[in-house]
A protein has these predicted regions:
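An alpha-helical appendage that flanks or caps ligand/catalytic pockets
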Residues: 1-106
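C-terminal helical cap(s) of enzyme catalytic domains, especially alpha/beta-barrels
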Residues: 121-135
Length: 135
């Protein structure tokens, strides 16, 4: 297979808002969800073989209740800091989303999948189509 023919897709929760605190709260569930995969890695590989930033962010995790999987406001996300939320999700005003998507494009990403489970799915999709993708 020709490696140059491979396309890269990225996926993340996203929320467009000038209110950064609100945006973070709407997507904090995503890094909490990802923490399940991080815990799997920690259980499979020696801690020293993993990036410190990866295992450090789950140190204060106290389990995960799948009854509240991918749920805005879930207690599953109590341990997730603003810094981790910012690194795992795309949050902030339209300009911040454009910048993140441009950075992903420059890194070779050809498709971006927005996880919209945020309670305002239609409004967020409309903003993405009108002001981010269509701009």
């Amino acid at each position: 297979r020709d490696p140059d023919a491979i396309e890269v897709q990225a996926a993340a929760a996203a929320y467009v808002s000038d209110d950064l605190e609100l945006a973070r709260d709407r997507v904090r569930w995503f890094p909490a969800l990802v923490s399940n995969h991080v815990v799997d890695l920690i259980n499979k590989y020696p801690k020293d073989d993993l990036p410190e930033s990866l295992w450090k962010y789950v140190e204060n995790r106290e389990g995960y209740d799948y009854l509240h999987h991918a749920e805005v406001g879930s207690d599953n996300a109590r341990f997730v800091s603003d810094e981790i939320t910012d690194s795992f999700a795309v949050v902030g005003p339209v300009s911040a989303h454009r910048e993140r998507l441009d950075a992903l494009r420059e890194a070779g990403v050809t498709q971006f999948n927005v996880y919209l489970m945020n309670g305002e799915e239609e409004d967020q999709l409309d903003v993405y189509g009108r002001e981010i993708i269509g701009a």
